[in-house]
Amino acid sequence: MVRFESTDSLMLARQLPNKTVALILAGGRGSRLKDLTATRAKPAVHFGGKFRIIDFALSNCLNSGVRRIGVITQYQSHTLVQHIQRGWSFLNEEMNEFVDLLPAQQRLSTEQWYKGTADAVCQNLDIIRRYDAEYIVILAGDHIYKMDYSRMLLDHVEKGAECTVACIPVPISEGSEFGIMEVTADYQITAFYEKPANPPPIPGDPSNALASMGIYIFNADYLFKLLEEDNNTPGSSHDFGKDIIPQLTARKVVWAHPFDLSCVTSNAELPPYWRDVGTLDAYWRANLDLASVTPELDMYDRAWPIRTHMEPLPPAKFVQDRSGSHGMTMNSLVSGGCIVSGSVVVHSVLFPRVRVNSFCTIDSSLLLPDVHVGRSCRLRRCIIDRACHIPEGMVIGENADEDSARFYRSEGGVVLVTRDMLAKLEAK
């Protein structure tokens, strides 16, 4: 393990991002989000009133000084590509800064789509090699968090690792949903299990397991060698978590990086924030948490801004209707272009250009862009997908049986409403 003096570490931390390329894996479908990802990839799903999920990984790269980024796409990529072209085209190519879109193109002789996360990178090796980077940061494009990758890069170099995996403790009951690792006292990974049925607990902490965050740093030449080996291995699923990382443990070249060392937070009293919003319930909770008095994720931190495509929209407006009832909101996020007329919005998130007509009550709900709510509606614990028109007088979220028959109701009782569901209901 290489040790640097503090001044050397500071200089190195500033230099490493310039020697690095980030690859964001953004081709996932996100099937557990049900119909919310029927027409868009999970990284393109709306979040937090005005953002897309992928904006967090992209913003982390820029804020960390990593300004060479490749975005690997596959499933339903049009919305994602459009968002990146509109909102992330400001980098300076003359300064060797870019966000490069890498769609699935059946590059290899097998003429197949990406078979796994490692294969997605492998099929783009000819492009990635031309980036001429010393280090490759591989990121999932579908997680919500703020992280300084330069700190993880420094940890990677100081330990002399060939590969470093970011990790975070998760409840042992949820361990089967993640890649779980066992580590030594100095965080060398000795074993790695992808979604094990019986995850091993952290020594001394039987209630938690140490989970992979799906964030990897590789020395570039070593990664290229690994991917070529894996591509020629019969029976491999060509996945980082299932194939690449487990085999590195025997070689003693892979280390874990605790997330709390590089987590960006404006409140040291709060635990490190990282969310895999892979289910409707998790997605709903993470959005509504932003509307709380003290959210776990600080979106107002000017030192670590989350960037996105900014539409030229007017401010939100709350007006009284003809009867004199005032539009009002409490503990909610309301985005630009919204109009609330003579209705009450409580603990909800209204995305851009939402229109709520008179005599409505919106409670604990997410209304995605361009939703139109007719008069006298009651919506509770709902996710209303983009451009839905809720008919006058409709009640959602108060009768579980009715909701399940008309829409999709999650295990946690959150109701997802889409345009197709409304069209089928209207056709009956």
Curated annotation (Swiss-Prot):
Q: Where does alpha-D-glucose 1-phosphate bind?
A: 114, 179, 194-195, 212
- Which keywords label this protein? ATP-binding, Carbohydrate metabolism, Glycogen biosynthesis, Glycogen metabolism, Nucleotide-binding, Nucleotidyltransferase, Transferase
**Where is the organism placed in the taxonomic lineage, from the top?**
Bacteria, Pseudomonadati, Pseudomonadota, Gammaproteobacteria, Enterobacterales
Q: What does this protein do?
A: Involved in the biosynthesis of ADP-glucose, a building block required for the elongation reactions to produce glycogen. Catalyzes the reaction between ATP and alpha-D-glucose 1-phosphate (G1P) to produce pyrophosphate and ADP-Glc.
Documented EC number(s): 2.7.7.27
Pathway linked to the protein: Glycan biosynthesis; glycogen biosynthesis
- Output the PROSITE patterns linked to this UniProt entry: ADP_GLC_PYROPHOSPH_1, ADP_GLC_PYROPHOSPH_2, ADP_GLC_PYROPHOSPH_3
GO MF: ATP binding; glucose-1-phosphate adenylyltransferase activity
Q: Could you tell me what this protein is called? A: Glucose-1-phosphate adenylyltransferase
**What reaction gets catalysed by this protein?**
alpha-D-glucose 1-phosphate + ATP + H(+) = ADP-alpha-D-glucose + diphosphate
- Domain of life per record: Bacteria
Q: How does it assemble?
A: Homotetramer.
UniProt organism field: Yersinia pseudotuberculosis serotype O:1b (strain IP 31758)
Identify its protein family: Belongs to the bacterial/plant glucose-1-phosphate adenylyltransferase family.
User: InterPro entries, from UniProt?
Assistant: ADP-Glc_PPase, ADP_Glu_pyroP_CS, GlgC_bac, GlmU/GlgC-like_hexapep, NTP_transferase_dom, Nucleotide-diphossugar_trans, Trimer_LpxA-like_sf
Q: A GO biological process this protein is involved in?
A: glycogen biosynthetic process
